[in-house]
Swiss-Prot record:
Glycan-bearing residues: N441
Gene: 3GT6
Signal peptide start-end: 1-21
Oligomeric form and interacting partners: Monomer.
Family indicated by similarity: Belongs to the UDP-glycosyltransferase family.
Name of the featured protein: Anthocyanidin 3-O-galactosyltransferase 3GT6
Reaction it catalyzes: cyanidin + UDP-alpha-D-galactose = cyanidin 3-O-beta-D-galactoside + UDP + H(+); cyanidin + UDP-alpha-D-glucose = cyanidin 3-O-beta-D-glucoside + UDP + H(+); delphinidin + UDP-alpha-D-glucose = delphinidin 3-O-beta-D-glucoside + UDP; peonidin + UDP-alpha-D-glucose = peonidin 3-O-beta-D-glucoside + UDP
Role: Flavonoid 3-O-glycosyltransferase involved in the biosynthesis of anthocyanins conferring flower red/pink colors, mainly anthocyanidin 3-O-glycosides. Catalyzes the addition of UDP-sugar to the 3-OH of anthocyanidin, with a preference for UDP-galactose (UDP-Gal) as sugar donor and cyanidin as substrate; able to use delphinidin, pelargonidin, peonidin and petunidin as substrates in the presence of UDP-Gal, but barely active on malvidin. Can also use UDP-glucose (UDP-Glu) as sugar donor with cyanidin, delphinidin, pelargonidin, peonidin and petunidin as substrates, but not active on malvidin.
Temperature impact on function: Optimum temperature is 30 degrees Celsius.
Expressed in which tissues: Mostly expressed in leaves and flowers and, to a lower extent, in roots. In flowers, mainly observed in petals, stamens and scapes, and at lower levels in pistils and toruses.
Top-level EC class as recorded in UniProt: transferase
pH-linked activity: Optimum pH is 8.
């Protein structure tokens, strides 16, 4: 099998859990649109493929390929944390390798480049064995990636087994941070089960990223200048964010639950939009406390809550707040955040949610859970000053009411928050303008991946 300079074959290896695969597909779609002669074979688990490619018709030059999820036939899940992820990781290299060989046979084209989620560190080995470039995509921010790239330094300085009770300690030696709370470093650096498959995956990732032909991250220079500067000295870094650019004008057929008409009837910057993503829902006691705070403060709210709301919310809450609220199983988040009536986004501080809030110019109330949530919350509150973190990272009625009052009341603090997030919104809007860094870096990425020079 041989390939010409055009008609190349690119393998895309996403991490098929949480919200990782969607932003990977988003940037691949942009590359595929600019390089119509290049075939992008997108490998993921059957469930992920079904979610990302609901139509049976292929997307022009992007071809989905299902690979094994690593779950043995007849396996019964025990409910342990990350059990499905651990099974996938154990079989991941072999699963992707088998998928790529099948795609080469199907297309009659050798793979010329491997593009992977940075989590899939073993993609470096696969690319080396194939003799092709390895390009990696980091779907989170530069701040969390910097911590993973300097894990050895952090552990040597603070000690791997001497961190209990030191969560509130402020440290000033981590490259990319003027200072950071020790407990806000990403999971797997000094806190959590450091020997778990997930933590080991992150550690190994940090050890091999320097081998990548490019490390494209979902951020832009103006948002994280110091972490970007540090990473650029260590890696072949390309800031190509936001991976999910600001959406086109709202379309009614994307709003099946009528969120936008409901928002149209509300005052400007008065509504709290609540959305915790797909894997980070607060426990029932916190959901109840959040509901009580919304009711007691008479805050209008739109809540994206997939589960039966009556199952978690206080008795009679839905009836008592019927004039204030709209609770839906799904909301068109980008459209909602862009609406003039939304005054705050209550979320888990996942990177995608943070970036979408920045793009829309909406302040944040954050309740972090795990992963990069804590360091994102640190950046939101202490560096960018575009929101507040729920005190103690636990919703209580009193704490939540205080946060709502701080962000939604028309005082000096609220004005400062909106001015700050508005500043970063302008940076996000300009990121893909002519001759801007993200635009130039995306062209560089396209040249590396597809051999195109725009």
């Amino acid at each position: 099998m041989t390939n010409s300079s055009k008609g190349r074959h690119v393998a895309v290896l996403p991490f098929p859990f949480s919200t990782h695969a969607a932003p990977i597909l988003s940037i691949i779609r942009r590359l595929a649109s600019a390089a119509p002669d290049v075939t992008f074979s997108f490998f993921s688990t059957p469930q992920s493929i079904q979610t990302l490619f609901p139509s049976e018709n292929p997307e022009n030059n992007i071809r989905p390929h299902a690979i094994s999820d690593g779950v043995p036939e007849g396996f019964v899940f025990s409910g342990k944390h990350h059990e499905d992820i651990n099974l996938f990781l154990a079989a991941g290299k072999e699963s992707f390798e088998a998928g790529m060989k099948a795609a080469e046979a199907e297309t009659g084209r050798r793979i010329d480049c491997v593009v992977s989620d940075a989590f899939m560190w073993f993609s470096c080995e696969l690319a080396e064995e194939m003799g092709v470039p390895w390009v990696t995509l980091w779907v989170s921010g530069a701040c969390s990636l910097a911590a993973h790239c300097y894990t050895d330094l952090i552990r040597e300085t603070v000690g791997m087994h001497d961190t209990a009770g030191r969560e509130d300690e402020i440290v000033k030696f981590v490259p990319g941070f003027s200072e950071v709370r020790l407990g806000d470093l990403p999971s797997g650096v000094v806190y959590g089960n450091l020997e778990s498959p997930f933590s080991m995956m992150l550690y190994k990732m940090g050890q091999v990223l320097h081998k990548a032909a490019a490390v494209a991250i979902n951020s832009f220079d103006e948002l994280e200048p110091e972490p970007v500067k540090v990473l650029a000295s260590k890696l072949k870094l390309l800031t190509c964010g936001p991976f999910n650019p600001i959406s086109p004008p709202p379309s009614s057929n994307l709003d099946e639950y009528g969120c936008i008409p409901w928002l149209d009837r509300r005052k400007a910057a008065s509504v709290a939009y609540i959305g915790f993503g797909t894997v980070a829902t607060p426990p029932p006691v916190e959901l109840a406390a959040l509901a009580e705070a919304l009711e007691a403060s008479s805050t209008p709210f739109l809540w994206s809550l997939r589960d039966n709301p009556k199952q978690h919310l206080p008795e009679g809450f839905l009836k008592r707040t019927s004039e204030l609220q709209k609770i839906v199983p799904w909301a068109p988040q980008a459209q909602v955040l862009a609406h003039r009536s939304v005054g705050v986004f209550i979320n888990h501080c996942g990177w995608n949610s943070v970036v979408e809030s920045v793009e829309a110019g909406v302040p944040i109330i954050g309740r972090p859970f795990f992963g990069d949530h804590q360091v994102d919350a640190w950046m939101v509150e202490n560096v960018w000053k575009i929101g507040v973190r729920v005190e103690g990272a636990v919703f209580t009625k009193g704490i939540t009411m205080s946060a709502l009052e701080l962000v939604l009341s028309h005082d000096q603090k609220q004005k400062e928050l909106r001015e700050q997030v508005g500043k970063y919104k302008e940076f996000a809007l300009k990121a893909f303008g002519p001759k801007q860094r993200s635009t130039c870096n995306l062209s560089t990425l396209l040249e590396i991946v597809a051999g195109y020079n725009l």
